[in-house]
Amino acid sequence: MSNSTNNLSSTKDLKRVLGFWDLMAVGIGSIIGSGIMSLTGWGIDDTGRSICIAFVIGGLIAILARSPQIFLNSVARYRGGDYSMVGTFLGPRWTGTYSMIALLTSVTLSMYALSFADYAMPFLPAFTRKSIALGILTLLFITNTFGINAFAKVQNLAVIFLVISLTIFTAVGLTKLDGNYFDPANFMTHGFVGLWQASVLMSYTCDGAQFVTQMSGEAKNPTRDIPRVMLFSTLGVSVFYGL
């Protein structure tokens, strides 16, 4: 094996400081996103109040779809995440194709920044939508230049704040639960077909844990932790959504 290949596969120059809970924060943060806001209404239209079941089924669908990555990351450390997996099994040509596709899809970061700005504008009336979006992108870019430790701390704080907020929202909502919530007239309104359609939609809202594979090179024990994180974060978030 050439020295260049050794350098590409070696992680001896990386800190490898990310433990299970650091990776879990990445997994949860990657799953929870705009899908829960934009698709839940469509799911309710398909299956009514059995949407809670659709979320759990959707989580299982997401795990099944990502099972190849779960299995692959249980046997080896892939320093470049998906890029390394593509390069290992398909060769340099397809690795280049993957890189070009990844570059094109990275423009969606601007969409996330603009969505953040939409939520932040009521609290920051002195700033425009574009300036807030540019500011958050710049802040996150600068954070990443300080290394993986800074990234992990910011990610952990963000996910803790996110989970606390959603927990409060869920707890308050459960106290206002209608006693007739599971009334057959409003449950599985379009039968098993409607439940399946809603589950497929909800699988998108429960997807995203695969991005934790990008942290393989910086993980302490990726073959143990990454598969567990992908499983537990997906199932945990899907059950949480169902509540």
Task: Explain the meaning of each model-derived region.
Residues 42-46, 54, 63-145, 150:
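Hydrophobic transmembrane alpha-helices that form the core helical bundles
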Residues 28-39, 107-111, 203-210, 242-243:
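Short helix-kink/termination motifs in transmembrane helices of multi-pass secondary transporters
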Residues 1-41, 45-50, 62-67:
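Membrane-interface "cap" regions at the ends of multi-pass membrane proteins
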Residues 19, 33, 72, 212-215, ...:
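Hydrophobic/aromatic residues within transmembrane alpha-helices of membrane transport systems
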Residues 96-97, 153, 227-228:
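Signature of the 12-TM Major Facilitator Superfamily
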Residues 16-27, 91-103, 132-136, 189-202, ...:
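Select transmembrane alpha-helical segments in multipass membrane proteins
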Residues 28, 32, 53, 57-61, ...:
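Lipid-exposed faces of alpha-helical membrane segments in multi-pass integral membrane proteins
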Residues 9-14, 52, 125-128, 156-243:
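Helix-loop-helix junctions that connect adjacent transmembrane segments
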